Amino acid sequence: MSEVLLFHHALGLTSGVLKFADNLRQAGHKVHTPDLFEGNTFNSIEKGLAFIEETGFDEMRERGVRLADELPHDLVYAGFSFGVLPAQKLAQTRPGARAALLIHSCLPISGDWSFGPWPNGVPVQIHAMDNDPFFVGEGDIDAAREIVETAEDAALFLYPGEEHYFADSSLPSFDAEASALLTRRVIEFLQRV
């Protein structure tokens, strides 16, 4: 059994994110789903990002990082899109990280947005669609490839399509087939880490 800290995307803690967490729980894992937006949800990425900007991206990320202080160190850190910011920071900087799951997004491990190199002994999976304009168009795919090239246990899974939030069952962008495959891969990953 793994213990997972799962951070939501820029639309908030939606029922689709909670459903994903429930799927992991049904497979025998303990999953924490903090609400960084304190109950607020949004119907567009633009509105969600505007909400984040009001608080500040750094502060919102650090809010997630601080939540980990109340939990054990040997966690799997997971994030959907915006939630990758605190998840990846924790996986790269908090001692004892068990693994990382980066879904719909990935930060570089070198350059301005970096938290440093990928840590030894921390397995990672990265999941996104191969024509997602955010993941592909904004450089996340390059960051993911850099992690896969340098980390000892890393995998990038690309699914056919262009939807950003394809794994959130509560949204019109949901892709049932891709999401089912992602969920299966994640559960298999959690069984071995």
What are these regions, as identified by a protein language model?
Residues 2-72, 166-167:
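Serine-hydrolase catalytic machinery in alpha/beta-hydrolase-like enzymes
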Residues 96-107, 123:
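A conserved short beta-strand
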